[in-house]
């Protein structure tokens, strides 16, 4: 199968490479031509074609039963502009996929607008960060059933597969989507994929914050505000490591935390000023709309706000985790 990919950053480029490794062909475009050239060079030989412009990409994809274009750009105006341009370049039967972190209500609107032109729209919440090339991507997507079936070869190639994760008892019973244990899921109509990914990221905020606070408490057990007899000098890297081995809180986030603390007990390479990319805010907005209490996620989001006005070790833990799973660097 052939697909166009727009935006070849940390995830978009790796998505292109992974698809070619699984026998698919890609037409790739990035606003920086050097990036496009680099990604083509990383792809399997003969399976990647560069496109200079969006119009060039649309032309190169002509002849396919349905032209499919995956947009992997930052949420907001840049993605909105790209989708609008594609809406004018593609036609009836073609498919636009937004694999970024778009606000789900924008997906609902775009889907309706594009449907008037006969263009299908799929929103894919994509998790996996810089590790997705080798591990695969966990994907939650929304769109019509027919479109989901057509792009299944693309999604199944990107997904991690069942791997060595134990199967959940009862999964063979009727009513369970077999794609879920392969690492990708058709959640429902347009907007539902990004909605589920939005909540996923809200949960991520809470989990990260719990680790950050816990390590901060342990580090501060040697604080001068305590009487000397009450102090413990604890090794953060060793504690993170032992927790990885069979504890209830073992997880990928803990793995990344252990790596960071093994490299540097103080995490002084991080300022502790923690960004938020929008999904946490949208999750809280959804909770308010639904009258659902979400105190943990709300506190985690507000802590990120606080981090930008005063630094402490907890925020350095968060920065280290974000760098570990997504290659996110702190804003200077």
Curated annotation (Swiss-Prot):
Gene3D superfamilies: N-(1-d-carboxylethyl)-l-norvaline Dehydrogenase, domain 2, NAD(P)-binding Rossmann-like Domain. It comes from the Bacteria. GO terms for molecular function: NADP binding; phosphogluconate dehydrogenase (decarboxylating) activity. Pathway: Carbohydrate degradation; pentose phosphate pathway. NAD(+) binds at residues 7-12, 30-32, 101. InterPro entries: 6-PGluconate_DH-like_C_sf, 6DGDH_YqeC, 6PGD_dom2, 6PGDH_C, 6PGDH_NADP-bd, NAD(P)-bd_dom_sf, Pgluconate_DH. Substrate binds at residues 101, 127, 129, 200-201, 205. It catalyses: 6-phospho-D-gluconate + NAD(+) = D-ribulose 5-phosphate + CO2 + NADH. SUPFAM superfamilies: 6-phosphogluconate dehydrogenase C-terminal domain-like (SSF48179), NAD(P)-binding Rossmann-fold domains (SSF51735). Keywords: Gluconate utilization, NAD, Oxidoreductase. The keyword NADP does not apply. GO terms for biological process: D-gluconate metabolic process; organic acid catabolic process; pentose-phosphate shunt. Homotetramer. Belongs to the 6-phosphogluconate dehydrogenase family. PANTHER family: 6-PHOSPHOGLUCONATE DEHYDROGENASE (PTHR11811). Catalyzes the oxidative decarboxylation of 6-phosphogluconate to ribulose 5-phosphate and CO(2), with concomitant reduction of NAD to NADH. This is 6-phosphogluconate dehydrogenase, NAD(+)-dependent, decarboxylating.
């Amino acid at each position: 199968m052939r697909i166009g990919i727009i935006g070849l950053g940390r995830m978009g480029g790796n998505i292109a490479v992974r698809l070619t490794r699984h026998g698919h062909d890609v037409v790739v475009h990035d606003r920086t031509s050097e990036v496009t050239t680099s990604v083509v060079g990383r792809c399997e030989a003969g399976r990647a074609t560069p496109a200079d412009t969006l119009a060039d990409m649309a032309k190169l994809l002509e002849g396919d039963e349905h032209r499919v274009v995956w947009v992997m750009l930052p949420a907001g105006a840049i993605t909105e502009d790209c989708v609008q341009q594609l809406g004018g370049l593609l036609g009836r039967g073609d498919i636009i996929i937004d694999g970024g972190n778009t606000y789900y209500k924008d997906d609902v609107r775009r889907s309706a607008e594009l449907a008037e032109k006969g263009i299908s729209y799929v929103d894919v919440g994509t998790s996996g960060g810089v590790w997705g090339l080798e591990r695969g991507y966990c994907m939650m997507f929304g769109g019509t059933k027919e479109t989901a079936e057509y792009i299944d070869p693309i999604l199944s190639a990107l997904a991690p597969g069942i791997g060595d994760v134990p199967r959940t008892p009862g999964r063979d019973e009727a009513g369970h989507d077999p794609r879920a244990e392969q690492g990708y899921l058709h959640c429902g109509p347009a907007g539902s994929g990004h909605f589920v990914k939005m909540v996923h990221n809200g949960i991520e905020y809470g989990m990260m914050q719990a680790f950050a606070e816990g390590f901060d408490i342990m580090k501060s057990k040697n604080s001068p505000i305590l009487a000397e007899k009450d102090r413990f000098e604890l090794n953060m890297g060793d504690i993170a490591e032992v927790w990885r081995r069979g504890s209830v809180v073992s997880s990928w986030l803990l793995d990344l935390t252990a790596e960071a603390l093994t490299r540097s007990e103080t995490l002084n390479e991080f300022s502790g000023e923690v960004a938020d990319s929008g999904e946490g805010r949208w999750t809280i907005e959804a909770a308010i709309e639904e009258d659902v209490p979400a105190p943990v996620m709300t506190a985690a989001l507000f802590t990120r706000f606080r981090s930008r006005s005063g630094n402490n070790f907890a925020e350095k833990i968060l920065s280290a985790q974000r760098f570990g799973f997504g290659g996110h660097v702190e804003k200077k």
